[in-house]
């Protein structure tokens, strides 16, 4: 779905583990990495699109994750002119995204990028929380920075709680 300004309505997905790391996926047949994302179909809510994309791209279902947060606003980025398909109607000049922060609630062995019709990714790894902001393709960087900044206080407690628990145990041994 493309809005009146030429932006494709889309969802972005940040999956966090209990160590405060995020899921980082390698685009199929390429050397570029990104978060899972995908378009919102006609009649679909952003949350429905997120769960559909999560399954198609990562193989996870609603019961495998917990929604921690949704971005307050739509975040937009423009495509570089070389990537705009000028011959398609309507012309899409960029993405307008609603972002979701999810916590993985299942074992990571459930991740399966072969469930969709054509795989979007052919590799993945856990990376530190801020790593994607520095590593994503430049035209998406500001949107990533804004989404990650908005989610930081909600994602970081997973890591901090685990670390604090270890410190308390170590202090008791003392």
Curated annotation (Swiss-Prot):
**Cofactors demanded by this protein:** a divalent metal cation
Q: Could you tell me the Gene Ontology terms of the biological process aspect for this record?
A: mRNA catabolic process
Gene Ontology molecular function terms on file: mRNA 5'-diphosphatase activity
Asked if the record carries the keyword Transport, the reply is no
The record's SUPFAM superfamilies line, in alphabetical order, gives: Nudix
State the span of motif (Nudix box). 38-59
EC number(s) per UniProt?
A: 3.6.1.-
Task: Tell me yes or no: is Hydrolase among this UniProt entry's keywords.
Answer: yes
- Pfam families, per database record: NUDIX
Protein keywords: Hydrolase
Q: Residue limits of the Nudix hydrolase domain? A: 6-149
Per the record, its GO cellular-component terms are: cytoplasm
- Gene3D superfamilies linked to this entry: Nucleoside Triphosphate Pyrophosphohydrolase
For this chain, the family text in UniProt reads: Belongs to the Nudix hydrolase family. RppH subfamily.
- What is the recorded function of this protein according to its Swiss-Prot or TrEMBL entry? Accelerates the degradation of transcripts by removing pyrophosphate from the 5'-end of triphosphorylated RNA, leading to a more labile monophosphorylated state that can stimulate subsequent ribonuclease cleavage.
Provide the protein name. RNA pyrophosphohydrolase
User: What is the originating organism of this protein?
Assistant: Vibrio parahaemolyticus serotype O3:K6 (strain RIMD 2210633)
Protein encoded by which gene: rppH
């Amino acid at each position: 779905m493309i809005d009146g300004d030429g932006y494709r309505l889309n969802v972005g997905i940040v999956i966090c583990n209990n160590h405060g790391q995020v899921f980082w996926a390698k685009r199929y047949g390429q050397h570029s990495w990104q978060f899972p994302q995908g378009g919102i179909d006609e009649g679909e809510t952003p949350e429905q699109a997120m769960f559909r994309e999560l399954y198609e791209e990562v193989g996870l279902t609603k019961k495998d994750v917990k929604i921690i947060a949704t971005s307050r606003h739509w975040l937009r980025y423009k495509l570089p002119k070389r990537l705009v398909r000028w011959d398609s109607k309507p012309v899409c000049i960029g993405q307008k995204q609603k972002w979701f922060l999810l916590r993985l609630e299942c074992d990571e062995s459930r991740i399966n990028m072969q469930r969709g019709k054509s795989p979007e990714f052919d590799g993945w790894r856990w990376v530190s929380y801020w790593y994607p902001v520095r590593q994503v393709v430049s035209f998406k960087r500001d949107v990533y920075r804004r989404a990650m900044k908005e989610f930081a206080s909600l994602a970081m407690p997973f890591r901090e709680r685990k670390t604090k628990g270890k410190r308390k145990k170590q202090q008791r041994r003392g």
